[in-house]
């Protein structure tokens, strides 16, 4: 299944800002945005960020919704995460024989 993920945090919870200010609970750079690499259950197809808005976007592929939730769980502690199942409209159009018509 394909999923579209949007992760949004605020400047107050921004891990980059916390690290720059020397917060004792700040994650090391290697741990920030680890989700970009995916894992055994979730393949990240595209990942992008709009840093000035503290917002990230991703298209991922996984067998189960729960696998995507687990991958993005660390982001859920600092802001809102929306995970939407998606249909592959390109594959659908091709499989229906309508591609190029």
Predicted regions and their residues:
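Short S/T/G/P-rich N-terminal loop/turn motif that feeds into the first structured element of a domain
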Residues: 1-53, 63-65, 88-101
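Amphipathic, hydrophobic secondary-structure cores in small proteins
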Residues: 56-57
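An amphipathic, aromatic/His-enriched active-site/gating alpha helix that lines ligand/cofactor pockets
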Residues: 61-95
């Amino acid at each position: 299944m394909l999923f579209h993920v949007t992760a949004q945090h605020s400047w107050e919870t921004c891990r980059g800002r916390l690290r720059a200010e020397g917060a004792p609970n700040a994650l090391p750079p290697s741990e920030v945005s680890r989700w970009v690499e995916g894992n055994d259950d979730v393949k990240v197809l595209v990942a992008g960020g709009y840093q000035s808005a503290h917002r990230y976007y991703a298209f991922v592929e996984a067998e189960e919704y729960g696998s995507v939730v687990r991958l993005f769980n660390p982001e859920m502690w600092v802001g809102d995460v929306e995970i939407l199942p998606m249909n592959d409209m390109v594959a659908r159009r091709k499989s229906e024989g309508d591609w190029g018509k």
